[in-house]
Amino acid sequence: SRIILHSRSTASRWGLGLGVDNLGSAGTGRDRNAISLSLDSPLELNDSLNLSFSDTLNHGPRYSRSNSLFYSIPYGYWTYSLFASHAEYRSPFTLSSATFYNSGRTDQVSVRTDRVLWRDQGHQLSANLQLAYKDVDSYLQKVRLGIQSPTLTVAEAGVNLFWLNSAVWNLDVNYAQGLTWFGADRDADHVQKNLPQAQFHKYRANLTQWRNGQWLGQPWQWQSQLSAQYSPDTLPAIEQLLGTDDSAVRGYRDNSASGAIGAVWRNTLRLPLNSDLAVKITPRLGLDNGWVKREHGAQSQRLSAASAGLNLSWKNVQLDVDYQHNLNTPAGFAQEPDVWLTRLSLQL
């Protein structure tokens, strides 16, 4: 008898992603590059490490840069994670033929624990606790803007429910409260009472659905996401719900809307085409709606937009093109042109 040994190939523990896109803002530069690095089980404990870096390509007087680290480690029904990030920007604007600069930075560190409470074949219920420290500095020329430069310590508690039926569902419900720990700003020190509050209370919910099917032999994939937020307090900008963004209501790039109270509903329909081509072709359509209010008593803003896109995938390369058109212009918004967005990515 003979014993024959064959080597088993295993997937690489490392992952490297490279990308370029034009998703940046007009003030800091549209064109950006991005690098992401991932490592599975660096301590051989089923843990994971992810690093990401992004920068604008113009390298002139305007820029936007960010980097982040995420590490997680499971232990039975528990998962512990650490997140840290740094971002900075510089944006010029002109008044009476003179050029001035807005600039700033944001540093964040958070620790989080998740615990699975119950699960069966089609459901999983978990709870989470998080403590985050956020430090923001904003400047006009070299003058620090105190109201726009909060230092916050935020505690959060939430529950997550994941379940399967004819679709895949995920529900997150979360409560956040600002604390006075670690040198955070104190509301008691404010002379004015209408300033953004560091010791705020905030409620958030997020419901996501993924559904697949076929129509006349054509497969389709529908993703729908509803995000809502409520706070009785005036919130710092970093804690507000953002209504205008490529991850919120698409189609608004020159104007922005955010607030303590609001909701965003995003819908994307994908139609993967059946073909013998080496390139996978997936057209898509999108329809988004949003509603935000900066604070109690403020005027609300309603947002809506439609989009059409195309994803081309070949081996480890993806090209994504998106056309976005806003369907209404809220009060105070300048008229928005239609938007073309492009992303090119390589995964190694």
Q: What are the language-model segments listed below?
A:
Residues 139-281, 286, 293-295, 334, ...:
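C-terminal outer-membrane beta-barrel translocator/porin domains of Gram-negative envelope proteins
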Residues 14-16, 43-49, 76-82, 90, ...:
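Repeated loop/turn-to-beta-strand initiation elements of outer-membrane beta-barrel proteins
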Residues 23-27, 54-60, 87-96, 104, ...:
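Sequence/structural signature of outer-membrane beta-barrel proteins
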Residues 1-81, 119:
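Outer-membrane beta-barrel initiation region
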Residues 18-22, 49-55, 82-88, 127-135, ...:
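Transmembrane beta-barrel strands of outer-membrane/channel proteins
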Residues 47-50, 60-161:
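Transmembrane beta-barrel wall of Gram-negative outer-membrane proteins
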Residues 29-33, 63-67, 105-109, 123, ...:
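Residues that define the transmembrane beta-barrel architecture of outer-membrane proteins
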Residues 37, 111, 207, 310-317, ...:
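Outer-membrane beta-barrel "beta-signal"
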